[in-house]
From Swiss-Prot:
Catalyzes the transfer of a dimethylallyl group onto the adenine at position 37 in tRNAs that read codons beginning with uridine, leading to the formation of N6-(dimethylallyl)adenosine (i(6)A). ATP binds at G8, P9, T10, A11, S12, G13, K14, S15. Keywords: ATP-binding, Magnesium, Nucleotide-binding, Transferase, tRNA processing. This is tRNA dimethylallyltransferase.
Amino acid sequence: MKAVLIAGPTASGKSALALALAEAAGGTVINTDSMQVYRDLRVLTARPTIEEEVCAPHRLYGHVDAAVNYSAGAWVNDAAAVLAEVHAEGRLPIFIGGTGLYFKALTRGLSDVPPVPDEVRQGVRARLDRDGPEALHEELARRDPQAAARLKPRDRVRIARALEVVEATGRPLADWHAHGLPPLLPAEGVTALFLAPDRAALYERIDRRFEVMAASGALAEAEALGRRGLDPLLPAMKAHGVPALIRHLAGELTREEAIAIGQIDTRHYAKRQFTWFRHQLPEFEWIAPNDARAWLGAKLGMTLP
């Protein structure tokens, strides 16, 4: 089963590389980024443009509403269906994105944690708001010591998630992780690379891109999200730039302050992406962006434009 996996930090040039490969090899570009699934965030997540999407088939982009707490498990299910369709069409699947957990699920499998009922999630979130993360971390230490030992006492999101699972299922996260979903792609036939640009140049590009976003629709996206009154803990509401821009629109930050926060958050995220892939998926080949087309062409026996 042939497939190409293109990972890398945000703003590293993944989309252009994937599109060039899709056009040259008859491929379908499959989103492997947890934020680009949201239809409400085309600008702020730097999704491919409509013009780019016309050049080659693109799947799993913008198919989820911001009100949905979309999970890695949901993505795996969606990706499995898309992968079957792409192979039936005789096209090359090209998975592209920066979400390490999605790539890990592709090649190594994923824990099969069942959905948490809304009433359980809402109850845990209410206690989190009322009592604070430290109190819930103490509760987690009693109910799932292994998870509590792994999490910092102020890690609101992960503490809440671990408590939701043990409360809904009666079993700790580790039990579910031990019995998971098999990988979608076997190791053989998979070409996997991580675009690794120079850090300083990448950070400059991130800063410039966020300024362009702010002038090209990002504020309108943030305003539309803010008007919906969604839970601020939803993934879409935590996308880089969204909280700061909403605060700016509410008069709490200047435009310059909001942009600076968005830039800093995005640079920090890029740094975490380097670290995560280095330790979690060492089988990915690290390639400089300027060398990526030649490297891919040699691997696949073709010339990329």
